[in-house]
Amino acid sequence: MKKLLTILFCAICGASIAAEKPGADESAKTPPGKSYTYKQSGGKPRELEIYFPPNHDPAKSKVPGVILFHGGGWSGGTLDQFRAACAYFASRGLVCATVEYRMMNKNDAKLPEGGSNKRVCVTDAKSAIRWFKQHAGELGIDPARIITGGGSAGGHISALATMNPGLNDPADPKDIDTRVVAYLWFNPAFAPADNKDPEIDILTHQKADLPPAIVFFGDQDKWKDGWDKAQAKWESLGTKTIDLQIAPGQTHSFFNKEPWRTVTLIAADKFLVKHGFLTGEPTLKAPATGEKLVPASPK
């Protein structure tokens, strides 16, 4: 009898633990994309993974390209964060890359007084975007239709890589710019302390002509204050291209987990259709649990 009770107790505990784990659609890992080395930095090769549409023929097809940068506080994170997103966008007809970049480190090469270690992240992101454009022919993408974005630190990095004319790697081709035509920003992390180094401060590099941008934030995200300041400045400049979507009750990085991963990807898909980068309807199904984003009212 004692043995039976022990077995039952273990079974109940196991069921409780299983209930706390992510669902199969969340915990299942998306296979890596095709790996390419886009540069050497910090003594290491830097990789990006690319996902291609079904039956994609680079010789015949030049589709928009998407390049996404993972989060992780500028000092961590992995390519896995956006593999599912890249695979989905590829299934919809885009060529999509997720990028590894050099992490900030207090022991990095000498920086000017007040310089932030985040600089190395931005420099690598600029190199990745240039590489993506430079190899547009073999990848089957249109270099004039590149979309970028990222999550948290990756959102910050993608913004500075495309807005700051500085922080270039001397080895990069000088005739290729880092301009893009749209942004997919998943709670981009714009820190107040960035104002100590203008090179990595979003408020230093904002202009009125921001390309269309969709931005996702949980209304309980402590990083939203930094975004609010950036959005207020864009609006003061006359920018009208920002589509801010709020996830009620959610905190930072909510988009990494289901059902919000699917909810944000569907919204990003519709945004890309609206601006002519995709056609048709999203192929993902909205969660049966009914979670929805709320469009933010203009300030």
Regions from the language model: what does each represent?
Residues 79-99:
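Short amphipathic alpha-helix adjacent to the substrate-entry channel of hydrolases
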Residues 60-72:
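Short beta-strand element of the alpha/beta-hydrolase
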